[in-house]
Structure formats: C-alpha cells, structure tokens
Amino acid sequence: KIYERCELARTLKKLGLDGYKGVSLANWMCLAKWESSYNTRATNYNPGDKSTDYGIFQINSRYWCNDGKTPRAVNACHIPCSDLLKDDITQAVACAKRVVSDPQGIRAWVAWRNHCQNQDLTPYIRGCGV
C-alpha cells in the first residue's frame, strides 16, 4: 500500500508515534518519506551484510526481523519480516518503537540523519489536522 501523506500522518498518530521517545510525528513522516516514499511494500537488499530493509520504515533483517536468509540475524522485534510489508502498519509501527527505544534513537536510520535532521519538517504534516 502506498499511503497518501495525510492518511499516513493520521495513522501514525493514532498508533501512538507522535512524541514517542521524544520523536515528533513530523520526524516519523520525514523518515517514512525518504525510506519508502510511504510504500509499505518497499524492500532493499544490502549486499555488504546480506541483509534486507523492509517496509514503510525500511527496518533491517540483521537486527529487527526474521526473513530466514540473513546471516546471524537477531530478530529483536520477534516478527517475520513479511509482517513489515503488510498494508496494516500496526506491526511496523510497533517494531519502529522498539528500534527508537535503543540508545541512538531515530539516528539509527541513515535517511533520517541525511534528510530530516536539522530540517524544517512542518511540510510533512501541514494541512493534515494532526
């Protein structure tokens, strides 16, 4: 599913991401835009460590989910990676909460550091009523 911007903003807010661990909704929206263009089905393979990034937040199979093909995977979210590709993003959000609970927080995502850090993020939620 490719979310419309305000639809995603409302969904993420409903699922409790706004302000979670001090991360604003606009930051999550920026992250989702740059990681997946709001597409729940996005996948990207990383040849270096043979891991794959899954879903709207591009959550990685080395640490966070099990895809049955990543060497030395940890599966800290205790889910199959396929759960991160569903139209219903409840489990993807739950896993993102787990990721951001680690010490580096939202800085765990390179796309956030490259595109969202120290930027004006208001356009990501403007006009959405959130």
Swiss-Prot record:
Monomer. Lysozyme C is capable of both hydrolysis and transglycosylation; it also shows a slight esterase activity. It acts rapidly on both peptide-substituted and unsubstituted peptidoglycan, and slowly on chitin oligosaccharides. One of its GO terms (biological process) is killing of cells of another organism. It is an enzyme of class 3 (hydrolase). Keywords: Antimicrobial, Bacteriolytic enzyme, Disulfide bond, Glycosidase, Hydrolase, Secreted. It comes from Oryctolagus cuniculus. Transmembrane segments: none annotated. Residues 1-130 form the C-type lysozyme domain. It catalyses: Hydrolysis of (1->4)-beta-linkages between N-acetylmuramic acid and N-acetyl-D-glucosamine residues in a peptidoglycan and between N-acetyl-D-glucosamine residues in chitodextrins. Belongs to the glycosyl hydrolase 22 family. One of its GO terms (cellular component) is extracellular region. It comes from the Eukaryota. Disulfide bonds join C6-C128, C30-C116, C65-C81, C77-C95. SUPFAM superfamilies: Lysozyme-like. This is Lysozyme C. Its EC number is 3.2.1.17. It is found in: Secreted.
